[in-house]
Amino acid sequence: MIKLCVFDFDATLMDGETIDILATAHGKGNQISEITRYAMAGELDFFESLQKRVSFLKGMSYKKVLELGSTLPLMHGAHELIQYLKSKNIQIVIFSGGFHEGIDPAMQKLGINLGFANYLHHKNDILTGLIGGEIMFSNSKGLMLQRLKSFLNLKTDEVMCVGDGANDLAMFNESGLKIAFCAKEILRSQADICIDIKDLKEIIKVI
């Protein structure tokens, strides 16, 4: 019986990539979106690509970041899936290689209480181009899930996870039910279930 569901955020619970949205607003969209694409396909080191992408945001207004973060579009079916999981008493957590500035408003909207992500460093309301946080490496989600399972006294087969990119592989390895949602091939090959319709309600049919 599933007791915990771990979600990726960008391109999973949220319809898009937070860093690409921020970069576009900062006039750096083309530079960052290509790096994001290669990183999520597993063709670049996640830590190095994250640092490089965030460096392009240097000079951006932090107030603007918060404004954009509060209006990120949720994936179709997100509300319905979260409500379904809650009705089954399944605990929900977000693991994001993105930013708290994006996931925190979404957590409020969806009624999710726990999320792990990174923080955009800023000084005098201006991004410095630096980043820190809990999910900065390709293995971060796996290590975080190990700790969470231990803390909650859960077995691997009591955990499901939903993701789309290469940095979700590590949490797949710690999960009993692995769901690839509109995912890159590197993740699809390791999944128990692949959902190719861009609607999170499809997951309700298979769990």
Swiss-Prot record:
Cofactors (names): Mg(2+)
Pathway: Amino-acid biosynthesis; L-serine biosynthesis; L-serine from 3-phospho-D-glycerate: step 3/3
Gene3D superfamilies hit by this protein: HAD superfamily/HAD-like (3.40.50.1000)
Active site annotation, chain numbering: 8 (nucleophile), 10 (proton donor)
Pfam families assigned: Hydrolase (PF00702)
Record has Transcription as a keyword: no
Family, similarity comment: Belongs to the HAD-like hydrolase superfamily. SerB family.
Biological process annotations from GO: L-serine biosynthetic process
Name of the featured protein: Phosphoserine phosphatase
Source organism of the structure: Campylobacter jejuni subsp. doylei (strain ATCC BAA-1458 / RM4099 / 269.97)
GO molecular function, one term: L-phosphoserine phosphatase activity
One GO cellular component term noted in the UniProt record for this chain: cytoplasm
Keywords: Amino-acid biosynthesis, Hydrolase, Magnesium, Metal-binding, Serine biosynthesis
Classification via InterPro entries: HAD-like_SerB (IPR050582), HAD-like_sf (IPR036412), HAD_sf (IPR023214), PSP (IPR004469)
